[in-house]
Swiss-Prot record:
HAMAP family: Acetate_kinase (MF_00020)
Entry GO MF terms: acetate kinase activity; ATP binding; magnesium ion binding
Function: Catalyzes the formation of acetyl phosphate from acetate and ATP. Can also catalyze the reverse reaction.
Keyword flag Cell wall biogenesis/degradation: no
This enzyme's EC code(s): 2.7.2.1
Catalytic activity: acetate + ATP = acetyl phosphate + ADP
Places the protein is found: Cytoplasm
Residues with site note (Transition state stabilizer): 179, 240
Record-given protein name: Acetate kinase
Main location: cytoplasm
Record's keyword terms, sorted: ATP-binding, Cytoplasm, Kinase, Magnesium, Metal-binding, Nucleotide-binding, Transferase
Length: 400
């Protein structure tokens, strides 16, 4: 029998939702509530393919959920709130405590709160959503799905930093990795598309959006990933620097008189493509600027692609080879140019890709861009974190 599952991504002043019919993975409706707690909150819901938008004051997440459930009934999406069978909540940080998704109890809620020091901007906001749904829908399973969980299979040699070991033991300082739900979804989908058991595949997953991370997935398990203790580490991103020499932080402080917090703000919000180009963090803008001869925009694109290129080589070495390279997320799914730059020169490791196929895969299309004879397959897969969340609600919420 079909179940209706809500996949939720709660921010401090927003609530993104998708209602999914399982196990068919059929999208029933989706929407977004913005400016929660502020004047003129915006509620957008998709009804029969059309977006319906209303503006009203919404004081908190409980009221937001209430309004969402009322809208479901008003638009005949459900007859009654009891039609909803479970909810799944994206939680950014599960630390070492949560190596997989988990049914939410009071104890789990408390542990997510304790992990807030590892994700102070995200976990408290994710909790607001969890508490609102548990209050208004107390009789159904609620499941937490952690961005970090998929990477908990990394070995010590991948997740430890070369710092005094007691920093790891005392403060939990280690690599955690993020985008786990996306990496898990696309790796499973790649195996399906190849009609091969995931246990037999070495996959390099490139989740490239405004935030970007690369993962080495061996036999379905993450063995390394580019993001670290925080999502600031790894490759160049839209506004994030990615890896830098840590000694640069005190050096910049000394030269500019800025505090550590201010420098961190620069690394998170004023660096990456935006910092390098000086104009935009949006790859589409930079591509246009580069075409019209702006050298710095071209340079930003070159740096961006070269960092990803380097991780692919590194992770192929870690897994003693690679069978599949996956591109996903906004840029990975849509930028013909970045995919081409990243794949350039990888023939030495068995990557032979077809420029024509590459040009044809845009806007949510899925498919292979390698030549048939290529030992390494290259595939573009639109990520679907919400379906992955719904699957985990079925599994961990006891609904199967």
């Amino acid at each position: 029998m079909s179940k209706l599952i809500l996949a939720i991504n709660a921010g401090s002043s927003s609530l993104k939702f998708q209602l999914i019919r399982m196990p068919e993975e059929e999208l029933v409706t989706k929407g977004l509530i913005e400016r929660i707690g502020l004047k003129d909150s915006i509620f957008t819901i998709e009804v029969n393919g059309e977006k319906v938008k209303t503006v009203q004051d919404i004081k908190d997440h409980v009221e937001a959920v209430d309004i969402m459930l009322d809208a479901f009934k008003a638009h005949n999406i459900i007859n009654d709130i009891n039609d909803i069978d479970g909810t799944g909540h994206r939680v950014v940080h599960g630390g070492e405590k949560f190596p997989e998704s988990v049914a939410i109890t009071d104890e789990v809620e408390k542990e997510i709160e304790e992990l807030s020091e590892l994700a102070p901007l995200h976990n408290p906001a994710n909790l607001m959503g969890i508490r609102a749904f548990r209050k208004l829908l107390p009789n159904i399973p609620h499941v937490a799905i952690f961005d970090t969980a998929f990477h908990q299979t990394m070995p010590e040699k991948a997740y430890l930093y070369s710092l005094p070991y007691h920093y790891y033991k005392d403060y939990g300082i280690r690599k955690y990795g993020f985008h786990g739900t996306s990496h898990k979804f696309v790796s499973q989908r790649a195996a399906e598309m190849l009609d091969k058991p995931i246990e037999d595949l070495r996959i390099i997953s490139c989740h490239i959006g405004n935030g970007a991370s690369i993962a080495a997935i061996d036999g379905g398990k993450s063995i390394d990933t580019s993001m670290g203790f925080t999502p600031l580490a790894g490759v160049t991103m839209g506004t994030r620097s990615g890896n830098i020499d840590p000694a640069l932080i005190p050096f910049i402080m000394e030269k500019t008189g800025k505090t550590a917090e201010q420098v961190l703000e620069i690394l998170n919000k004023e660096s990456g493509l935006l910092g390098l180009s000086g104009t935009s963090s949006d790859l589409r803008d930079l591509s246009e600027e580069a075409e019209s001869g702006k050298a710095r925009s071209q340079m930003a694109l070159d740096v961006f692609a070269s960092k990803i290129h380097k991780y692919i080589g590194s992770y192929a070495a870690r897994m003693h080879g690679v069978d599949v390279i996956v591109f996903t997320a906004g840029i990975g799914e849509n930028s013909v140019e970045i995919r081409a730059k990243v794949l350039e020169g990888l023939e030495f490791m068995g990557v032979y890709w077809d420029p024509k196929k590459n040009e044809n895969l845009l806007r949510g299309k899925e498919g292979f861009i390698n030549y048939p004879h290529s030992p390494v397959k290259v595939v573009v897969i639109p990520t679907d974190e919400e379906s992955m969340i719904a699957r985990d609600v079925m599994t961990f919420g006891g609904l199967k």
